[in-house]
């Protein structure tokens, strides 16, 4: 059975408590439970790990080598600072999807730069905690055959990807 690893960086253990006006009231445990259940529906094992420490995240990435098929990562503040986590991801050659709960492009200027986006197979930004579910859905779409994949430009210049041949089309928005 394929395995997806969800990695969460610093302060995401406070999800649901920290700045709910930005990040919402859903807890990290809620997110993990939803993703694990969604994985089961698609015959995918979903594991999750959170750390406030860069080295622990790097160690977990290294442990994933040859054991994990895809990583869903919310590097949190490390998005803008960690070449080391980027290098770890590239070093193990596991494809990854970058997720951010808030729209980092609508926040402070320093949050606009990511050390991960250019290497990610997809970036899901600003969909709240649903972004994790969208990442799992996107990853499991590879199980479907004969998908008609399309994209278009949104009103704000964002790129919207969608699979029109699915009974319930899934959107992935990249700003």
UniProtKB/Swiss-Prot annotation:
One of its GO terms (molecular function) is 3-dehydroquinate dehydratase activity. InterPro entries: DHquinase_II, DHquinase_II_CS, DHquinase_II_sf. GO terms for biological process: 3,4-dihydroxybenzoate biosynthetic process; quinate catabolic process. Substrate binds at residues 74, 80, 87, 101-102, 111. It comes from the Eukaryota. The active site is at 23 (proton acceptor), 100 (proton donor). It catalyses: 3-dehydroquinate = 3-dehydroshikimate + H2O. Pathway: Aromatic compound metabolism; 3,4-dihydroxybenzoate biosynthesis; 3,4-dihydroxybenzoate from 3-dehydroquinate: step 1/2. Transmembrane segments: none annotated. SUPFAM superfamilies: Type II 3-dehydroquinate dehydratase (SSF52304). Keywords: Lyase, Quinate metabolism. Its EC number is 4.2.1.10. It holds the Pfam family DHquinase_II. The record marks 18 as: Transition state stabilizer. Is involved in the catabolism of quinate. Allows the utilization of quinate as carbon source via the beta-ketoadipate pathway. HAMAP family: AroQ (MF_00169). Homododecamer. Adopts a ring-like structure, composed of an arrangement of two hexameric rings stacked on top of one another. Belongs to the type-II 3-dehydroquinase family. This is Catabolic 3-dehydroquinase.
């Amino acid at each position: 059975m394929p395995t997806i690893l969800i990695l969460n960086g610093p302060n995401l253990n406070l999800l649901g408590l920290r700045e709910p006006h930005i990040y919402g009231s859903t807890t990290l445990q809620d997110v993990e439970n939803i993703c694990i259940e969604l994985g089961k529906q698609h015959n995918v094992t979903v594991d999750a790990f959170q750390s406030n420490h860069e080295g622990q995240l790097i160690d977990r990435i290294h442990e994933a080598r040859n054991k994990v098929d895809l990583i869903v990562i919310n590097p949190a503040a490390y998005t803008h600072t960690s070449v080391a986590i980027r290098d770890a991801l590239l070093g193990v050659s596991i494809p990854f999807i970058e997720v951010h709960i808030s729209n980092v492009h609508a926040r402070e200027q320093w949050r606009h730069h990511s050390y991960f986006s250019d290497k990610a197979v997809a970036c899901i930004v600003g969909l709240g905690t649903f972004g994790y579910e969208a990442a799992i859905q996107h990853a499991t779409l590879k199980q479907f055959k004969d998908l008609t994949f399309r994209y278009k430009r949104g009103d704000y210049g964002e790129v919207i990807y969608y699979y029109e041949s699915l009974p319930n089309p899934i959107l992935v928005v990249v700003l």
